[in-house]
Amino acid sequence: MLPRIACTVATVCLTVVGIAAYNRHHYRPHGDNPRDPDAVARKGDVEPVAGDYMRGFYYPAHGVARPGTVVVFKGSEGGNNDDMARQIRDRGYNVVGLYFFGQTGQQGFLSNVPLEFFDEVLAWIKEHGNIEEPITVLGVSKGAELAANLAIRYPEINNIVLYAPAAYNYQGLNFRQRNALPSFTWRREPVDYARLPFFPSTTVRLFMNLPVSYRKTYEVSLAEASNRDAARIPIEKFSGHGLLFAGDQDAMWQSDSAVQELSERNKNLEGVIYPGAGHLFSTDIDQEYGRIWPTMLGGTVDGNRAAKIQSDKLLFERLDSWHMDT
């Protein structure tokens, strides 16, 4: 009996390991590692930017540069939003594309990220006086959460563009720590956040290397948060202008609700929610994100394509008006 049980257990374990290995290959992400700065440098036409914490690249404008600087961030994948930086640079803007964790001298994971690293960014911009003002900060997903937190603390920021934003601060993403940690700190103090609940089904899917939709996790996190008011990002403190984008089928978190709430609390923020779009907009989402996108990101192929085209048009209309020659 015992040998038969042992054989059955071994068979099940091997089957699980085999399925997980297949899923790792089947759902592997496309393209370069977003955290690899060498991959950005190899594309050329960039200059490294570095400080004590600040890491990233400067993208000098093509052609006659518009006044000011656009600072861009990506999200929890750890990139510097290279594609968006190049797209904006090609339209005549000086752009700084920055990492905010995962690089040498930075937090290894998206937790305890010191917001005051933006002091270094402002100092770098000031040294390049021809591109000093205005300053627009653009962020995507957790990078949008970062951008909103910077905007309410730094009056030097004139404009913000938030893709798939959050209206609240959420727990940091550090899977090597059992204890909950904040995403951000300010002057060495943690920024209040809503903790993420534990769902066994999510753990199983992660173990099996299957894509996960986290929207329910974030919705439950906010609904159950005893410190909801403290975790709220007080966007009404931001006195500049802003543009907010979301898809109504975002599978990562409730960015559509966040766009509504943020734009209601600050009337200088223009919110746009695209039907049929998910967490990230793309003209070819299959090619760009592979097989993970329907579950993790949401939306439809056509909806995400339309959102990318329409949001790009509106983005450059607003950037052109914010960064006008005087």
Where are the language model's segments positioned?
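Conserved alpha/beta-hydrolase
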Residues: 90-105
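Alpha/beta-hydrolase fold nucleophile elbow
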Residues: 129-141
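Alpha/beta-hydrolase active-site loop
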Residues: 108-129, 149
